[in-house]
């Protein structure tokens, strides 16, 4: 893997510079395919097979292939990610799956402004697991205005457990074909939301300490555009679950305005697509 601070890989394996993506931005209204950025990072301090961000976003890219003509771009968005605002300005949607993402989105003023511009023009926003996280409380307010929920602050709640994830009775399009399934995962719960929020739909719940907790949601933002989030996916092996792959795929597609059949989408992948990336210290 290159040591440059950012890496952009088209799913067709064509490597292109960030400037070329930015130059395409005016074509968004001229019929070009919608472009979705899949933002991951190198491994953090968690053990192998957890927080496998790049392997996760590459799998999402695989699932999104041949879905309504979307153009999917996998990005290793390690700080300082100076080209990030350019890339976001050329995108129609973004998936955030990286370390302490709520802090990461908001800590750089230009980066936050680019996410806000993406939201303002109706772009789709998806966040997965620690991508919605911040140890500090300060980033929460700006983040929830974009994504709807945040795992943030010193009072944030999380738990590793074996439990059944249960789709809500909302009839939401993201839930097409999704059934209850038992999983072992770390879930964030009691998530922070905007002070006044409407049209935020709980999608999936898990019983934690006797209470049903929302761990996935869909939100039609008041100023236009859609946001989707799922707080699971601590363990990379959970991508092997059909229900997980379907939930994430359909959440991303819904966020960018793509139709989802009532019975859900096929999410078959090769076994090799489910493997985590080798760690630098692996033998």
What is the role of each PLM region?
Residues 1-5:
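Positively charged n-region of N-terminal signal peptides that target proteins for export
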Residues 7-18:
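Bacterial N-terminal signal peptides
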Residues 24-33, 40, 59, 66, ...:
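Extracellular ligand-binding/catalytic regions of CAZymes and related secreted enzymes
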């Amino acid at each position: 893997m290159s040591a440059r601070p950012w890496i952009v890989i088209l799913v067709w394996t064509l490597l292109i510079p960030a400037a070329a993506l930015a130059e395409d931005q005016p074509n968004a209204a001229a019929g070009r395919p919608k472009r979705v950025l899949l933002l991951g990072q190198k491994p953090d301090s968690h053990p192998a097979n957890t927080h496998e961000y790049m392997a996760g976003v590459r799998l999402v890219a695989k699932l999104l292939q041949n879905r309504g003509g979307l153009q999917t771009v996998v990005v290793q968005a390690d700080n300082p990610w100076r080209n990030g605002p350019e890339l976001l300005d050329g995108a129609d949607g973004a998936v955030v799956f990286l370390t302490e993402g709520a802090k990461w989105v908001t800590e750089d003023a230009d980066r936050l402004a680019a996410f806000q511009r993406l939201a303002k023009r109706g772009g789709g926003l998806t966040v997965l697991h620690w991508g919605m996280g911040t140890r500090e409380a300060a980033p929460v307010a700006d983040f929830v205005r974009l994504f709807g929920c945040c795992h943030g602050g010193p009072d944030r709640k999380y738990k590793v457990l074996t439990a059944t994830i249960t789709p809500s009775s909302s009839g939401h399009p993201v839930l097409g074909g999704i059934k209850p399934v038992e999983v072992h995962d770390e879930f964030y719960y009691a998530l922070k939301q905007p002070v006044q929020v409407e049209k935020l739909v709980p999608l999936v719940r898990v019983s934690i300490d006797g209470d049903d907790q929302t761990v996935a949601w869909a939100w039609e933002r008041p100023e236009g555009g859609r946001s989707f989030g799922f707080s699971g996916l601590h363990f990379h092996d959970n991508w092997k679950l059909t229900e997980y792959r379907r939930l994430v795929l359909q959440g991303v597609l819904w966020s960018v305005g793509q139709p989802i059949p009532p019975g859900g989408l096929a999410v078959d992948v090769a076994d090799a697509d489910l493997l985590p990336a080798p760690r630098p210290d692996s033998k």
